[in-house]
From Swiss-Prot:
Gene Ontology biological process: translation
PANTHER family (UniProt xref): 30S RIBOSOMAL PROTEIN S18, SMALL RIBOSOMAL SUBUNIT PROTEIN BS18M
Origin: domain of life: Bacteria
Pfam families on file: Ribosomal_S18
Family, similarity comment: Belongs to the bacterial ribosomal protein bS18 family.
Cross-referenced NCBIfam families: S18 (TIGR00165)
Source organism: Ehrlichia ruminantium (strain Gardel)
One MF term in the entry's GO annotations: small ribosomal subunit rRNA binding
Biological role stated in the UniProt entry: Binds as a heterodimer with protein bS6 to the central domain of the 16S rRNA, where it helps stabilize the platform of the 30S subunit.
Protein name per the record: Small ribosomal subunit protein bS18
Subunit structure: Part of the 30S ribosomal subunit. Forms a tight heterodimer with protein bS6.
One GO cellular component, as annotated: cytosolic small ribosomal subunit
């Protein structure tokens, strides 16, 4: 229902007009879908391999998601368990 005194058809957001370009998706760059751990098969995912595990953690010590590292889901699960095990044994910091 419309109440008296309320304007209809005007833009309620202020001085900006509707722009269909504002709702378009932002362009993004496609990353390669290849798993970086598949290329170097001689390195296995182990909790004692600090150099490999530190590549998949942020500078704050958090585990990077697979959409950033482009690691397959199976390797991501192995990485997360190895990182958690290395944290528990004080080989990697928690933060």
């Amino acid at each position: 229902m419309l109440k008296k005194g309320k304007k209809t058809g005007s833009n309620s957001s202020g001085g900006t007009a509707y722009s269909p370009l504002a709702y378009l998706k932002r362009p993004y760059f496609r990353r390669s879908k290849a798993c970086p751990l598949e290329q170097c098969a001689n390195e296995d995912i182990d909790y004692k391999n600090k150099a490999l595990l530190s590549k998949f953690t942020s500078e704050y010590g958090r585990i990077l998601p697979s959409r950033i590292t482009s690691v397959s889901s199976r390797k991501q699960r192995l990485l997360s368990t190895a990182i958690k095990r290395a944290r528990y044994l004080a080989l990697l910091p928690y933060c």
